[in-house]
Amino acid sequence: MKALLPRTLRLIRRPAWVAATCLLLMGCGPEARRAPGGVTDRQQQEPAISGSGNILAVLVEQRGRPTVQLRDLRTGQPLPTRHLNRHQPHSSPSLSWNGRYLAVITQRGNRRMAVIEDRLTGRAHPLRSPGNHDPVRLSLSPDAQRLALQVSDRGRWRVELLDLSGVLEADRPGGLRLSTDEPTP
């Protein structure tokens, strides 16, 4: 009977191949579920979530312009931004670990620039990229000590890394010590 079956059918009859095929067709893990507080009725784009998973940033249309909106995922409540409403449209939101810092690209006149809002102190930190190139996308490191900027430079894409350690205080996961001279009890 083996001789009558094509080689590929003989391979499929083996239990290991059957199991592997089933895994590929069904997926490797449990089905993802919608998190509470994670959905609103507005059209949303470019999601970014804080490292702690507690704050969501999305772009929504306000007065015909993309505007960043923050939401506390524990309560479902919107969170205010202090400086960003003056400079729109927004693009490419990125959050630090606890959501203290929100980085976004804004439009000021005919120039695009990266701005980081410190939600704890209320300060805005406008950043110009070296060479004064227009930013296209950005990504803030979880501790807010580095910013990766994709820029357009004479028709070519380039990524620039900015060191923010002299500008921003680090945003570390809760309970993480910076240093200690005393032994832990």
Where are these regions (language model features)?
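Blade-terminus and WD-like Trp-Asp/Gly-His loop motifs, strongest in beta-propeller folds
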Residues: 47-55, 93-101, 138-146, 182-185
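Structural motif
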Residues: 65-69, 111-115, 156-162
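Bacterial signal peptide processing site
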Residues: 29-31
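Post-signal-peptide N-terminal segment of Sec-exported extracytoplasmic proteins
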Residues: 39-82
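Surface loop/turn motifs at the tips and blade-to-blade linkers of beta-strand repeat domains
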Residues: 37-42, 82-87, 128-131, 175
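Short loop/turn segments that connect beta-strands within beta-propeller blades
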Residues: 73-76, 118-122, 164-165
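C-terminal motif of bacterial Sec signal peptides marking the signal peptidase cleavage site
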Residues: 25-27
